Amino acid sequence: MPVKSTARKKLSRATRRDLDTRIEFMEGIVRRDPDYVDALQLLGDDYTQRGRFPEGLQVDERLASLEPKNSLVFYNLACSYSLTRQFDRAVAALEKALRLGYRDFAWLAKDPDLKKLRAQPAYRSLKEKIQRLKKKAG
């Protein structure tokens, strides 16, 4: 499963180089096996860390088609939509993630990838749903 990461961290030159090398490697794997979910997850995370949000979004959309019942895939898709300023789509993906069982409310509240989304009016109604789910979870 991918790690929680954010593209907001300033990356050192060595880290950028390592990420670029890993991206190139993972792109090769995905070219050979376009349905390799684990490779796609790593590639999407690396694109996001590197600030390559449109490419990360393409990967997350691909993952959503391959893993339609995976709550974390839809959470990451919401992050990609938020990072590309597609806020209505981000809300829809986040709603689906919650319907599928995503429950890491603490991370959702502070994830920097969703910062701009949380400032949007569309997020308000979703915030109410999140509060109800938190109460239910106990």
Where are these regions (language model features)?
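TPR/TPR-like alpha-solenoid helical repeat scaffolds
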Residues: 10-19, 103-129
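Long, contiguous interaction/recruitment modules in multidomain scaffold/adaptor proteins
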Residues: 1-28, 138
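Boundary/linker segments of alpha-helical solenoid repeat arrays
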Residues: 71-72, 100-110, 137-138
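Accessory recognition modules or surfaces
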Residues: 39, 71-72, 114-125, 133-138
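Alpha-helical adaptor scaffolds
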Residues: 11-15, 27-85
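TPR/TPR-like (Sel1-like) alpha-helical repeat modules
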Residues: 88-105, 128-135
